[in-house]
Design a protein with these regions (language model features):
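Active-site-adjacent loops and short helices of periplasmic peptidoglycan-processing enzymes
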Residues: 2-114, 118-123, 137
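Domain-terminus/edge residues, biased toward the C-terminal soluble/receptor-binding domains
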Residues: 90-91, 102-107, 111-317
């Protein structure tokens, strides 16, 4: 449902659908098993109501209706989900439906879910703050509370999403903001609703107490100038489109080391925002994380002479 929300917000931003637009409820959406917001077949429902039903009530029916409105069908929408997962760097995920219902080819990991949740908060901050902290939603004369218990237990928690299937157990992606810092936690396979909330709160408290937020690079600060072949410019500035901040155990920041691994040969054209390198971070010589580095500017293709010269240089490289 988190990926479905991400793609829904993207579709609204692109003008594919609108918040106040009504969409038809198909029989497939109406029959969706599991948790529902109880939309009725052959009726029209506002997109914003479907968003609330999906996020607050965990409505599988709402997910199917949104998928059909955006992509014309759930299978097409699943293809969009997989493309977006690749773009976001979710390396161990495969999507087959919009709701997260069990399927042998539908899977993900805690790391990938954290990546997705972080991307949603980063890319759609207004939508996140508007919908994910809602404590209840009423539709079709039925009021359902948000299944995220932490919203009622800790005022610093403002999301994100619960999940449950017999195979996966009780799951919770949670986020809290205390002062300027925001942390995410992911708990999968808990034995009960209470356990997933308890373990999530433990993780958040531990993170805030024992980790520092360390900024390694500022937004649009060049990490390096990388060589570009056959381009109008011979180099391109590489960096991050937002402040690059890591959670690091308290007192360990001076022991971090970084290594930039570029994608060579890097050929023009290069678009701004294109991933062109990886920043490898280590702590005390042990891998700590790998993070995509993007082009901070565009580099067009060079003219015929410039391309020919670089072709010769590449031949002897």
């Amino acid at each position: 449902k988190l990926m479905t929300a991400y793609l829904t917000f993207a579709a609204i931003k692109q003008g594919t659908i609108k918040l106040d637009q009504t969409v038809p409820v198909s029989e497939k959406a109406w029959k969706a098993p599991g948790s529902r917001m109880f939309i009725q077949v052959n009726t029209q429902v506002k997109v914003e109501d479907l968003i609330k039903g999906m996020i607050v009530q965990s409505g599988n029916d709402a997910c199917v209706a949104l998928a059909e409105a955006i992509a014309g069908g759930e299978e097409n929408f699943a293809q969009m989900m997989n493309r977006e997962a690749q773009r976001l760097g979710m390396k161990a995920s495969s999507f087959r439906n919009a709701s997260g219902l069990p399927d042998p080819q539908h899977y993900t990991t805690a790391r990938d879910l954290a990546t997705l949740a972080g991307a949603l908060i980063r890319d759609f901050p207004e939508e996140y703050s508007k919908y994910y902290s809602l404590k209840e939603f009423r539709y079709n004369n039925i009021t359902q509370p948000n299944r995220n218990r932490l919203l009622f237990l800790d005022p610093t928690v403002d999301g994100v999403k619960t999940g449950f299937t017999d195979a996966a157990g009780y799951c919770l992606i949670s986020s809290a903001k205390r002062g300027p810092r925001r942390l995410l936690s992911v708990v999968l396979g808990a034995a009960s609703d209470g356990v997933r909330a308890q373990e999530s709160l433990k993780l958040l408290n531990y993170g805030f107490q024992f980790y520092d937020a360390v900024q390694l690079y500022a937004k649009d600060q060049p990490v390096s100038n990388l060589k570009v072949w056959k381009g109008g410019s011979s180099t391109v500035k590489a960096g991050f489109q937002g402040d690059f901040i890591l959670a690091v155990p308290k007192g360990f920041a001076p022991r971090l080391q970084t290594e930039l691994v570029s994608q060579q040969p890097l050929m023009a054209p290069v678009s701004a925002g294109q991933t062109i390198a990886t920043l490898k971070v280590s702590l005390d010589g042990k891998p700590y994380g790998e993070y995509p580095v993007v082009a901070l500017e565009a580099v067009p293709v060079a003219g015929a002479i410039g391309r020919a010269i670089d072709s010769v240089r590449l031949w002897f490289k």
